[in-house]
Regions:
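N-terminal export signals
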Residues: 5-26
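Conserved N-terminal/central alpha/beta ligand/cofactor-binding core
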Residues: 11, 77, 83-84, 89-175, ...
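Short, low-complexity, disordered segments immediately C-terminal to signal peptides
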Residues: 24-39
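A short, basic/flexible loop-to-alpha-helix module at the beginning of a structural domain
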Residues: 44-59
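Flavin (FAD/FMN)-binding glycine-rich loop and adjacent Rossmann-like elements that form
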Residues: 53, 125, 153, 170, ...
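Beta1/beta-strand and adjacent pyrophosphate-binding region of the FAD-binding site
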Residues: 57-68
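N-terminal Rossmann-fold NAD(P) dinucleotide-binding loop
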Residues: 71
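Conserved beta-strand-loop-beta-strand element in the redox core of flavoprotein oxidoreductases
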Residues: 177-195
Length: 292
């Protein structure tokens, strides 16, 4: 390589480094607190976590753990009574499996009457959510409408904000502190470290009963066919009038033209609380989606 070309490349590389460095702002350096010596015999397969003080970052009348549709409805209902309400969610969006898991049908908006006719069965906050999505043009079908997940996230976000609810994302419920059969504090695992919230009332909307379990309540372990839902685009680009065309139903209609959603269920019943098996299934299903 000629020296000039080498220097030119070197200067470009240096510029790239400077540019990337300039994208970050320095903050005050924080020292990692002393975790103490590791207690316990690691050869036994267990360790003992050293005790530590956990900062109480908030106090509230009602704490709702889990920001799925049930958690959002519970938080809005609590806030509308005048109670100060906090909603915590482990991910970066509301809606749970409805939005993040792409389980897009809004079930069940209708039921069968004694005359075997479809009658409306959803009212209250659930109905408000459905109507907002319809007004945005982001719901198809009157009965059990299929929605757009990003629109649903937006609608839920707006309703939570309008209700005056304090929202904490990226917060995973890790433990509870109980006394006299009452939860006094919920401990959250966050990127800021472990923090605690002291509520008067806790509503468990985690979907798996995490708070019930952490509080020491009895529970049953269920097994499910664990699948991975996905969306498929450009499914209506083929001219159906073309000779030899055979229609194949691939998934259900969504509010976005040419985009269908596909519910790929698992073939065997699995334990949804086994994080190792869930990790394996996540990999297997995602590869299967692309390979098929």
């Amino acid at each position: 390589m000629k020296r000039r070309n080498f220097l030119n490349r070197l200067s470009l590389s240096a510029g790239a480094v400077l540019l990337s460095s300039g994208c970050r702002q320095p903050i005050d350096k924080k020292e990692t607190p002393d975790k103490g010596d590791l207690a316990g015999n690691t050869n036994s397969g267990f360790i003992v976590e050293p005790s530590r003080e956990i900062p109480v970052v908030d106090k509230t009348d009602v704490l709702v753990v889990g920001g799925g549709p049930g958690g959002v409805a519970a938080a809005i209902a609590a806030s509308r009574t005048g109670a100060r309400t906090i909603l915590v969610e482990r991910y970066n969006h509301l809606g749970g499996l409805w939005t993040g898991g792409l389980v897009l049908p809004l079930l069940s908006t209708h039921g069968l009457s004694r005359k075997n006719e479809q009658i409306k069965a959803i009212y209250g906050i659930g109905d408000e959510i459905a109507e907002r999505l319809k007004n945005l043009g982001m719901a198809v079908n009157e009965v059990n409408p299929v929605v757009d997940p990003e629109a649903a996230k937006y609608v839920l976000e707006m309703m939570v904000k309008e209700a005056g609810i304090t929202m904490y994302y990226h917060s995973w419920a890790a433990n509870v502190i109980s006394s006299d059969d009452t939860i006094k504090a919920v401990i959250l695992e966050t990127k800021s470290g472990r923090v605690a919230i002291e509520p008067k009332v806790v509503i468990d909307c985690t979907g798996d009963g995490d708070i019930f379990h952490l509080a020491g309540e009895d529970y049953d372990v269920m097994q499910f066919e664990i699948g991975l839902v996905h969306r498929l685009g450009n499914v209506d680009r083929v001219d159906p009038s073309r000779p030899g065309y055979n229609k194949i139903n691939i998934g259900g209609e969504t509010p976005i033209p040419s985009v269908n959603w596909v519910n790929m269920t698992g073939g065997e019943y699995e334990d949804a609380l086994d994080f190792k098996r869930l990790s394996e299934l996540q990999q297997e299903h995602r590869i299967e989606i692309w390979d098929n």
